[in-house]
Amino acid sequence: MHDKKTELKTVVQNIKDIANTFFPSGKVVDIVDNKIAHLTATLPYPFNEELQGIANSSGIPLGEIVIFNIFYEIFTVCTSIVAEDKTGKLYHARNLDFGLFLGWDVKNNSWTLTRELKPLVVNLDFQRNNKTVFKSTNFAGYIGMVSGVKPDLFTLTMNERFSLDGGYVGIFEWFLGRRDGMWMGFLTRSVLENATSYQDAKEKLAKTRLLAPAYFILGGKNSGEGCVITRSRTATLDIWDLDIKKGTWYVLETNYDRWKPPLILDNRRTPAMKCLNQTMQENISLPTIYDVLSTKPVLNKLTVCTTLMAVYNGHTETYLRECPDPCSPW
């Protein structure tokens, strides 16, 4: 964390500047620095100690580290894909889009926070007894997991799900003392650490009460093991599975329920599905999926990076992205 403290301070300062734009008195930042830090003690081990460790290492106030971790629960706009080729091999990929409405830089024609997050992208290898448990692409300073692969078992990404009963409500309840819901990023990390199979991971993602609604995109190691789990904070609303016999050789999730049309100003789903259909199952691979995720507006000004994963041997690769103009802001 020490190596990334300058970059993390830049991002946290940006978040504070945005807060001060809406609340010029500075009271919001004061509350963050003086009140929210105490709530760290309400988090389960090891998350509470890790947040304190990051604060100590970076020199950033603990409350601001907590807020940095909260932001992922409510400001992400992503595209995730699980696809199976003709031989039964599974691929999992995602565009990580972050920073919606968090400061537009007119001079550089980009989202300020999106640009500042790119130096914080890290590839992590979580080990126990010198053996890899899982691998993940993540932000330095963020203790949850946004994506990961458990070698030879499963792959996992999460996308935010927009809902009236959304992350803001759950976070507010947490501040008020109701803490029976789990943070999305903490759940994905727990599943990557502890789940022993695709089915075990699927069950944990479907049944755990959440702080915010979410989509969990899960891939396994066997033919047909791939799904999108649509979650409210308290229940599973839908599970969309791969079904090769019925012609469903991929599942794709942006940030909208699959049975509803996407927002007209944010339709990444239709172009991505069109590209996948044109690619066809016999040509699907990590390079062709990368091409799909490079198609505008699937690739847009919010895109921080593209991550490609294959469950076999825990393969993962990540590319920082730039979307050349003309390019959609989201």
Model-derived segments and their meaning:
Residues M1-C78, S190-W330:
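C-terminus-biased signal that marks the final domain/tail of proteins
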Residues D3-N14, I18-K27, A41-R179, W183, ...:
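A contiguous strand-loop segment
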Residues R94-L96, N138-F139, M158-F162, L187, ...:
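Short, structured patches in soluble enzyme cores that scaffold and shape functional sites
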Residues G177, L187-L192:
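Short histidine-centered catalytic/ligand-binding loop motif
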